[in-house]
Every structure is written in C-alpha cells, then in structure tokens.
Amino acid sequence: MVETFYEKDADLGLLKEKTIAVLGYGSQGHAQAQNLKDSGLKVIIGLKKDSKSKETAQRDGFEVYETSEAVKKGDIIQVLIPDEVQSEVYKKDIEPNLDEGNALGFSHGFNIHFGQIVPPKNVDVFMVAPKSPGHLVRRMYLEGKGVPGLLAVHQDFSGKAKELGLSYAKGIGCTRAGVIKTTFKEETETDLFGEQAVLCGGTTSLIKAGFETLVEAGYQPEIAYFECLNELKLIVDLLYEGGLKKMRYSISDTAQYGDITIGPKIIDDRVKETMKDVLANIQNGNFAKDWILENKANRPVFNALTEKDNNSLLEQVGEKLRAMMPWIES
C-alpha cells in the first residue's frame, strides 16, 4: 500500500540551522528556492559562471555563488540543473567540495539510478520530486496550498535522510498536498516510460499519424490540425480534472462510442507489446546509454529529428492557425 506523508509527518526545524544550496535557477530551481526562503530557511543559489539566471536570482533576494563555492557553503545541496550536464558538474564542482554529513538532494533520479553520479558514502542522498512544473509549485505555495511530491532515499549516512527529505518537502509546500514514498529506480523508470510511451513520444506520434492520415486522404490540413491537435487540449483538460469518467461524461455519446469501440483498435495489443519493449529498454539502461552517447556526440540525432518536425506541414499549419487565436500566449 502506498505510503503518503503530510504536514504532521515533517519537521521543518531539521533544516533551520542549515544552509541549503540550490544549484540551478530554472523552472524548479526558482520555485523551490523561493518557497524554501519563504518557509524561513537559509537558501543560497549556485550557478555556473556568467549564468543568465544570476540577475534574476539576485533580484529575488538570493546570494548567488559559482557552483563550487555554493557547494562549499551548503549543508544541503539540491541539484536542479539539467540531467545531461549533472554528471560533469558533479565531478568538477560538487564532489570535490562535499563535506562529511552533507546531504545531496535531487528532483529526478536519472543520474543516481544509472550510475552517472556515485556519491561518497559519508553523505545523505535523497530525492524530493514535485509532480508539477515549477511555476505551479510556486503559485500553489503562495496560495497556501501545495502540489503532490515524491520522496526517495538512496543513501542514509546520518540516519536522518528520510526526515531531511520530508523537511525539505515541507519547505517547498509538497506536504500540504501529500508526499508519496518511492525509490530512485521507480521514479526514474516510470518517469522516462511516461515521457516516451504516453506523454511526449506516444502523444506526438499519434497526432502526426492522425494528421497525415487525413491530409493524405484529401482533407484540408487546417481542418486536420483542428481535429488531431488543437482539440486535444479540451480532452486532456477533462482527463486532468476528472479522469476518464469526467471526460466521457462531458463529450457526446457519439464521441464516447467511438472512444470505447475504436480506441482499442488503434492502441491494440501490438502497441502494448511495443510499450513493454520500451520499458525494458529503460530498465536495462540502454536508453540512458543512448542518451549519454548522443550528448557526447553533440546530439546529431536529437537535432536532426527535431529540425524535421519543426519544418513539417503540421507545424507550418499550426503556426498560421494559432495566429487566429488571440487567447493563446506565444
């Protein structure tokens, strides 16, 4: 049974005498740092030299240091820089400056789980992963609410890693909503699978296939765009708010009949078998190896496939149609 923690389970006092060094000031970095500061904790920011985020962080009231110096000053080091650069930054700026008894925090388990970062045995390692983008983490905190989060402990040198993680989660507002216990393995593998098979890879490929099917059958690309991409937001919003039940309650009976009878023919057992292969490719580390090598080679496949989609008919039509929708912020 899932184990969930709330406000009463976390003691913010565990962090009151500590300095939290937040590395990175992007989507999660700015939100987590500001929430921690507003919770009465001492927070500093670590950024690479000449970072464009430096002025923003200073304007938000933080002392900003180069990454290595922030690590030296910190007791809790929260690593919120992109996955693909974490390993290099860890080896260069973090590992040489860690002290015994420090805690390393993450919001995604990729580099720990796949062995790209191997912390020394004399530090705690935990993960607190808010299940929303940074702007929502911040907004909910300011409204006196919070977003759900995940908690995992990879290494418990102090005997208090779980408690420190919960204290951190409370500081950013997650315990207001609930924090679910997990592992670095579970968070990493399910997160990657969701991105590849459903949220990003599965969704974009479904959109492209549907759009191309209609256009190849002679329908206007603009109409195909509305039916296969634009209206997706209406359905996703309903799913987000109330699951399958609310979505099906809100659409027409004709749409629901097509949903429940035709949908399984599109996403059939063959697709599910492919999904199992995708999951296995994540579990055995092959995807991680591919992504690491892709970055070392300056992303030739990443850049080529992205450019291809950016120049597609789907994107050209979408750009024109979105100009007709003043409610959409570009």
From Swiss-Prot:
Q: Where is Mg(2+) 2 bound in this sequence?
A: 191, 227, 231
Look at the named UniProt entry and state the broad enzyme category this protein falls under. Answer: oxidoreductase
Residue stretches in coiled coil: none
The cofactors named for this UniProt entry are: Mg(2+)
Q: Which UniProt keywords apply?
A: Amino-acid biosynthesis, Branched-chain amino acid biosynthesis, Magnesium, Metal-binding, NADP, Oxidoreductase
Indicate the residues that form the catalytic site.
108
Q: Which GO terms describe its biological process?
A: isoleucine biosynthetic process; L-valine biosynthetic process
Gene3D superfamilies attached here?
Answer: 6.10.240.10, NAD(P)-binding Rossmann-like Domain
Example of a GO MF term: NADP binding
Tell me which PROSITE patterns the record gives.
KARI_C, KARI_N
KARI N-terminal Rossmann domain: residues covered: 2-182
Cofactor: how bound: Binds 2 magnesium ions per subunit.
Q: Which GO terms describe its cellular component?
A: cytosol
Name the chemical reaction catalysed here.
(2R)-2,3-dihydroxy-3-methylbutanoate + NADP(+) = (2S)-2-acetolactate + NADPH + H(+); (2R,3R)-2,3-dihydroxy-3-methylpentanoate + NADP(+) = (S)-2-ethyl-2-hydroxy-3-oxobutanoate + NADPH + H(+)
One matching Pfam family, short form? KARI_C
The UniProt entry, under InterPro entries, shows:
6-PGluconate_DH-like_C_sf, KARI, KARI_C, KARI_N, KARI_prok, NAD(P)-bd_dom_sf
Report the pathway entry. Answer: Amino-acid biosynthesis; L-isoleucine biosynthesis; L-isoleucine from 2-oxobutanoate: step 2/4; Amino-acid biosynthesis; L-valine biosynthesis; L-valine from pyruvate: step 2/4
Listed PANTHER family: KETOL-ACID REDUCTOISOMERASE, MITOCHONDRIAL
Q: Which family does it belong to?
A: Belongs to the ketol-acid reductoisomerase family.
Known role = Involved in the biosynthesis of branched-chain amino acids (BCAA). Catalyzes an alkyl-migration followed by a ketol-acid reduction of (S)-2-acetolactate (S2AL) to yield (R)-2,3-dihydroxy-isovalerate. In the isomerase reaction, S2AL is rearranged via a Mg-dependent methyl migration to produce 3-hydroxy-3-methyl-2-ketobutyrate (HMKB). In the reductase reaction, this 2-ketoacid undergoes a metal-dependent reduction by NADPH to yield (R)-2,3-dihydroxy-isovalerate.
This protein is called what? Ketol-acid reductoisomerase (NADP(+))
Q: Which organism is it from?
A: Petrotoga mobilis (strain DSM 10674 / SJ95)
Q: What taxonomic ancestry is recorded? A: Bacteria, Thermotogati, Thermotogota, Thermotogae, Petrotogales
Q: Gene symbol?
A: ilvC
